[in-house]
Structures are given as C-alpha cells and as structure tokens.
Amino acid sequence: MAEIGLRLGADVPFFLRGHNAWVEGIGENITPLTGDTQLAAADFLVVKPPAGLPTDAIFSAADLKRDTEAATMRGFAANAYGFGHNDLQPVAQRLCPGVTQALNWLETHQLQGRMTGSGSAVFAQVQHALDLAKVQESAPEHWQVRLCSNLGVHPLAGWATA
C-alpha cells in the first residue's frame, strides 16, 4: 500500500504508517521517532487563507532553492518545533499573498508561523494561553483557523496492515 501511496504523493506513505517519523528521499525512507527522538505533545494554531496554492507551481518555480544542506534526525530532535525552515515558503509567499498575510497575522498573536508543507496553510506552535474564540474572531473573513494538537500515534494506526 505504501508503494501505491508514494505514487499519489510523497507524504502518503508517512500518513499510512500513522506514527511520528523522520522522512527522507521522496517519502520512501521512513524512520519512526521513538525514545529520545519522540516528539513532545504540543498545540498548534493552523491557518488556511482562502486562496489555494498548486504544488506543481511551487516545484516548477525557477527561484525555488534546491541545494539546501541535508538535515539530520538528531538535529531535528534537539529542537523539533523550532527546527529548520521550509524552502518552499519564499516561493509560496511570492505566488500567494495570503501566505504572507497569514504569517503576519500569526505574528500579531505573538506566534512564529511557517508553512505546513507546499500549500497555503501555515501553522505556529502555541506556547502560551490563547483565547481561541477571540483569535478566530480576529481572523480575516473566509480564513480557516483551528487549534490542533499533535498525535504520537494516529488512532487508526495499523488499520492498513491488518
């Protein structure tokens, strides 16, 4: 099933596994995060502006940085929620002003945002008390704003292997 999933998208095999993992290559090399690399529980504010952003537009952009030094799992584990950057973000911000607007909006709530992947959604770890209703009310019209918590293991993990 993971091989079929890989043809659908690089993140599909990861989601089929249902566990936090370090993923390399184009999604085919998956190492579960366990022990000292396991992610701590955390809350996140996820913001989706109304405009979408086609993945192929980002990956075909001439200004996409393609020579970033490889990251390591140990480096990630040392500061998982502050680790690294998303090379897709500058291109996404150029192609979709809503990405920049959402990042700036998060900053008004003292949150450090970054892109979730290759789409227009952004997220920020919430490390302080947050009045969710007030925050959602302050969002521009048609934005989706959700408070989410990470999962160490998805509740349906293992269903695809049974």
Place the predicted regions along the sequence by residue.
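Residue-level marker of motif borders
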Residues: 6, 112-113
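Glycine-rich beta-strand-to-loop/alpha-helix junction loops that act as flexible
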Residues: 115-120
